[in-house]
């Protein structure tokens, strides 16, 4: 009887942990999609909130950017679409990899770029925030 009770309690704890992590993955995926949408809609308020003040940004050209430099670029963007998202959660840290298709305009004219990216998110005061991001160009 005791063994069955202990097994039942452990099963409930494990199921809760699995569902909890699934919920967190859904929250993180929502942050990633909302961030792409914010770039598309030039929602600087959201971008200021979702990126940590001391975010580490490595561009597809290998440049280190500040949060302010990243947000200044928003006006050039027409759309950002993220796909193939994979999430790994390690406590209050999440690692997201995926593919991004970005279109926009710059001094050279219209562009369309495809990237593989990695975002590192940290859960701060109950909210997921991007603390590091790196992109690698898939265009040859």
State where each predicted segment sits:
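Hydrophobic pocket/interface hotspot
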Residues: 35, 47, 55, 70, ...
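A mature extracytoplasmic/lumenal domain signature
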Residues: 51, 61, 86-91, 100-102, ...
């Amino acid at each position: 009887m005791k063994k069955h009770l202990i097994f039942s309690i452990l099963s409930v704890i494990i199921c809760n942990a699995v569902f909890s992590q699934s919920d967190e993955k859904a929250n993180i995926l929502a942050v990633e999609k909302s961030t792409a949408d914010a770039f598309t809609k030039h929602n600087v308020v959201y971008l200021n909130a979702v990126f940590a003040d001391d975010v580490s940004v490595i561009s597809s050209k290998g440049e280190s950017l500040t949060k302010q430099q990243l947000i200044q670029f928003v006006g050039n963007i027409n759309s950002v679409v993220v796909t193939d998202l994979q999430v790994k959660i390690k406590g209050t840290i999440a690692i997201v990899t995926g593919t991004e298709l970005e279109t926009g305009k710059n001094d050279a004219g219209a562009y369309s770029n495809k990237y593989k990216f990695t975002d590192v998110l940290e859960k701060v005061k109950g909210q997921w925030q991007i603390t590091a991001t790196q992109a690698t160009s898939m265009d040859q």
